[in-house]
């Protein structure tokens, strides 16, 4: 085996293998986004004796104190069950970094530590061997965190396993609320379409509204546009919306049908108890439809014919479709836009041969007092599998300068206080 820099083509061909479980940050498109942010990029990997790539990683070189922080965002990519290969990679990476002005290196691999069911019952053993291997190479582990951290990628995820399933069989595994709300969205006639680059502001409007409502930390517009600009068809932006003209027409047709049926039944003499109950039920439905029709007509008058309900940013790579971020309108939440969007994207996975639908981030704190308990409950209702990643690892390469860097950083933080 040999450790080497890789060409873009070598890197791309390797990470296209879905069995390697690569992340959307470890794709060739991310080279352009990192360079657009002003960072140099280097692709480092391992080749076997037949010159085949068996490990790869995209590193950003972040200028710091006359040196570089080497950060592989969700790398490296390899068969991490092969501890011998991981050991070789880390050992050779250390040699490379000592020769290339590295201050310190950060790795946060897309590698599993443990898997749980939706109720946090373990399904696998803990992968302590992998964590201990990093530590044996001098890496500091950021810990088994159970909260969001702006300096780290998420460590917990909610994932749907689609392998061997159909939309119908998968839907049976959802809880009653998920099933009911998906059906509501369908009955309302909610549609989903993909936004073009020129329409991305429609996503941002919903995203900013959700940010203001929830108080969650958000990304800048430029952050999103960087991906939109460079990721091409690997970034998907669905928009769930309702066309009130179509909905009102559907309501009116349904109302007319119910009124005609009620009138026909009323015209009959000697009505049975069963018929009287049916008439009473139709009267309730007619009253409901009239209220819905009035509300929809008023909304069309004040808010327009098209109501944008929910939107999201998704990344698709060889391994999965990943829900990165989203937003929705609280004013129109009765139309169940987020449910329509997620159900549409789950079906997109089936239609395009994906075996994983990743709802992505969770804090790891599953208690009722946690900051994202509502998010967990939402994802839990889809019967997700909870995946815990191994976390962040740091290693100082230039130890003297690293000590100085940390000392200055502590001083700066004290001055801010």
UniProtKB/Swiss-Prot annotation:
Pfam family, one: FemAB
Tagged with keyword Transferase: yes
GO cellular component, one term: cytoplasm
Subcellular location, record wording: Cytoplasm
InterPro entries in the cross-refs: Acyl_CoA_acyltransferase (IPR016181), FEMABX (IPR003447), PG_Glycine_Bridge_Synth (IPR050644)
GO-annotated molecular function: aminoacyltransferase activity
EC code(s) of this entry: 2.3.2.18
Keywords assigned by UniProt, alphabetized: Acyltransferase, Cell shape, Cell wall biogenesis/degradation, Cytoplasm, Peptidoglycan synthesis, Transferase
GO biological process, one term: regulation of cell shape
Function: Catalyzes the incorporation of amino acid(s) into the interchain peptide bridge of peptidoglycan, using aminoacyl-tRNA as amino acid donor.
PANTHER family registered for this protein in UniProt: AMINOACYLTRANSFERASE FEMA, LIPID II:GLYCINE GLYCYLTRANSFERASE
Name assigned to this protein: Aminoacyltransferase FemB
Gene it is expressed from: femB
């Amino acid at each position: 085996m040999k450790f080497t820099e890789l060409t873009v083509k070598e890197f791309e061909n390797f990470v296209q293998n879905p069995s390697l479980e690569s992340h959307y940050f470890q794709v060739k498109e991310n080279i352009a986004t990192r360079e657009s942010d002003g960072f140099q990029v280097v692709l480092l990997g391992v080749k076997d004796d037949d010159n085949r790539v068996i490990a790869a990683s995209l590193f950003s070189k972040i200028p710091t104190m006359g040196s570089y922080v080497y950060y592989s965002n969700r790398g490296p990519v390899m068969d991490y069950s092969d501890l011998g290969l991981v050991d070789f990679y880390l050992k050779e990476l250390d040699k490379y970094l000592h020769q290339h002005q590295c201050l310190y290196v950060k790795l946060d691999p897309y590698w599993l530590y443990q898997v749980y069911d939706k109720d946090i019952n373990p399904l696998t053993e803990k992968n302590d061997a992998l964590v201990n291997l990093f530590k044996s190479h001098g890496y500091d582990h950021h810990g088994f965190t159970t909260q969001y951290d702006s300096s780290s990628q998420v460590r917990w995820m909610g994932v749907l396993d689609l392998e061997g399933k159909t939309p119908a069989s998968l839907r049976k595994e959802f809880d009653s609320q998920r099933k009911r709300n998906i059906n509501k969205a369908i009955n309302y006639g909610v549609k989903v379409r993909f936004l073009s680059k020129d329409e991305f502001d429609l996503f941002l409007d919903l995203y900013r509204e959700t940010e203001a409502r929830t108080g969650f930390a958000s990304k800048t517009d430029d952050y999103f546009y960087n991906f939109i600009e460079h990721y091409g068809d690997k970034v998907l932006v669905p928009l769930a919306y309702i066309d009130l003209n179509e909905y009102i027409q559907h309501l009116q047709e349904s109302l007319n049908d119910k009124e005609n049926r009620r009138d026909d039944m009323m015209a009959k003499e000697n009505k049975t108890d069963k018929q009287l109950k049916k008439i009473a039920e139709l009267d309730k439905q007619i009253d409901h439809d009239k209220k819905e029709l009035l509300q929809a007509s008023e909304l069309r008058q004040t808010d327009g014919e098209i109501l944008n309900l929910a939107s999201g940013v998704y990344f698709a790579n060889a391994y999965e479709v990943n829900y990165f971020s989203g937003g929705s309108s609280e004013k129109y939440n009765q139309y169940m836009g987020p449910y329509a969007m997620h159900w549409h994207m789950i079906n997109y996975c089936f239609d395009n041969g994906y075996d994983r639908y990743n709802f992505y981030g969770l804090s790891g704190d599953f208690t009722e007092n946690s900051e994202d308990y509502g998010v967990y409950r939402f994802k839990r209702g889809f019967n997700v599998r909870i995946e815990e990643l191994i976390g962040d690892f740091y290693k100082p390469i230039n130890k003297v300068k690293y000590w100085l860097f940390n000392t200055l950083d502590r001083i700066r933080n004290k001055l801010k206080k």
